[in-house]
Amino acid sequence: MSEPLVLETSRLRLVPIATADAEEWWGTIWSDLDVARYLPPQGILPVEAVRERIRIAMEHWATHGFGIWMLRETRSGSLVGHCGLLANESSDPELVYALCRQVWGRGLATEAAAAVLAYAFDTHNLAQVSAYVFPRNTASSRVLRKLDFHAEGQVRRFQAHLDHFVLRHE
C-alpha cells in the first residue's frame, strides 16, 4: 500500500494517525466524557487503550489504504479531533469522527467528513459508506444528513441500538 495521504480543507489539515498522537488524542477526545460517551465503548479510555487503538489504526492503514486522520486546525495546528473510514467485515466501510467540545457547532465535522468521503470515493471506488450514531447524538445525525447520508433504520452494535446511515456514491 502507498503511504497514507495528508488531506487539507479550508480550515483543517487531516494527518494520518501516528504513535506520537496518543497523549494529545487522549486529552482531546478520550478523556472528555461529553465526547467519549458517543464513542464505543461509551466512556473515558485510559491512555494505554488509546495507544492500542492507534496501533490498530496504523495496521488498518497498511492493510486497507485508508483509516483515521487526526484533525488539526490549519491556523493553530491544534488537534481538534479525528475523522476517517474503517473497513467493516460485515458491511460497507464506516465513516467515523469525533471533535472536541471546544469546536462543536462550527461545521468542522462536516468539512472533515466531506474531505474523507471525496478521497474514499475517488481513490478507492467505493459504492457506499455507512455510519452509525447513538440516537441521542442529534448533532452527529445532522452532520450525516448535510453530507446526504440517508437513515436506514437501527442496528444493534457495541451493546447498543444505533441509527444506521448510508451514503451511496453516484
Language model feature labels by segment:
Residues 40-43:
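Short glycine-enriched, charge-decorated loop/helix-capping segments at active-site entrances
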Residues 46-50:
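Short amphipathic alpha-helix in the helical subdomain of ABC transporter nucleotide-binding domains
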Residues 57-70:
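A short helix-loop-beta-strand connector motif used in the catalytic cores of GNAT acetyltransferases and
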